[in-house]
Amino acid sequence: MVGFEDHIAAITRNYQVNPRLDYRTVTAVNGPLVILDNIRGPKFSEIVTLTLGDGTQRKGQVLEIQGKRAVVQVFEGTIGIDAKHTRCEFSGDILKMPVSEDSLGRIFNGSGKPVDKGPNVLAEEYLDIQGQPINPSVRVYPQEMIQTGISAIDTMNSIARGQKIPIFSAAGLPHNEIAAQICRQAGLVKKSGKGVIDDHEDNFAIVFAAMGVNMETASFFKRDFEESGSMDRTALFLNLADHPTIERIITPRLALTTAEYLAYQCEKHVLVLLTDMSSYADALREVSAAREEVPGRRGYPGYMYTDLSTIYERAGRIQGRNGSITQIPILTMPNDDITHPIPDLTGYITEGQIFIDRQINNRQIYPPINVLPSLSRLMKSAIGDDMTRGDHSEVSNQMYANYAIGKDVQAMKAVVGEEALSSEDKLYLEFLERFESSFVGQNHYENRDIFNSLDLGWSLLRTFPSNLLKRITEKTIKQYYSRSSKGTVDSTN
């Protein structure tokens, strides 16, 4: 008998049984939140499976713990949950995302489940959607340019690999079309047939997350990616407007977890686009209101700055890893108000902004990017001889200066009339018109590489005599001013 007991102990000593407890203690449902009572040992961020009376299962996450009381946010919404028939099972684990290189070319909903009629992704790893904290000392400064094929971005507001730079838009502006165009055309700069870094053509991937978009917009993105052939290198996460609002809180984190795996394990250069961050912030406000927290500015929670930083700061590069994450969040400013808390806090965290202008859009110019309030703080590390071309910085500075002067002359013309303008003033007006129509404006499917964009910039700067180009050195003027421009207004690639 003793030997039998020893045998049983030997074959079971390596097994630990943690029975999952099933509760029927729902005490209240408040918006997207479910309050449970008499819970034994709940854990913060623990995943909870709620089984409704009809057998339907929904996932939730522990948001707050007060003794034996737990507040759970339900990702699929709380409609149909009642106190009598709902069973809640605590998993003892946090929310993890199954990740694999096979995620590319797939379409997921806002909860990370495939919706493209394909099989579930065969997971190579399960990663915490909150990401791993990155030691600041091992971060690598962003360098080398991400080429979007859009002249106003590539030439005037160059994006460095590993940068986070938002697009500030507003309702009714073509930010969705711009996002789709960036996905179609984005890549690293190719120079004279040789890449800046090895194998970057094959190692470039895109993770696209849409939050709170309508069915028409979701269909547009899916159709555009499939028709352009960029779907094979894209992982698409779609949270529709009729999906539960609470789901929008985890959608960007699922997308970024996938991006981190592709960047740091598969060593790909990943471009992450998140639209619309305003929908995300509204979902955050809804949860905060349901928890009866003290509201901050315009009803948004006081911790929104910290929460947004947990998303934006997941971009970057790490020592010892060849991959990188470049992030372009897109947000719509309510009432075109750049002082609204969402763009205001986003601007503090990110490294610049690209500004979509309604007045330029009203003049039928696409993409309606206003370069004056736009800024890329890391542009200096993304351009130059080794990465784009030696004249890039000077051309950008000179076009900025001439465009700003042209705007001043345009305002003066409205007051004093064209007759009072000097011949030099008229040159700036001519440059202003050509800059907006020919340089900023381009076709939806026109992919200009950085070298064509710089040549096009020179063709505009030749409007002026060389002595007026005061932000360009004599050496650069001798090299580029007299030669014919390769970039043309009607060129399409």
From Swiss-Prot:
Signal peptide segment: none
Main location, first listed in the record: membrane
Keyword Membrane among UniProt keywords: yes
Domain of life: Eukaryota
One GO term describing the cellular component: endosome membrane
SUPFAM superfamilies: P-loop containing nucleoside triphosphate hydrolases
Family: Belongs to the ATPase alpha/beta chains family.
Protein name: V-type proton ATPase subunit B
Organism: Dictyostelium discoideum
Lineage, broadest ranks: Eukaryota, Amoebozoa, Evosea, Eumycetozoa, Dictyostelia
Gene that encodes it: vatB
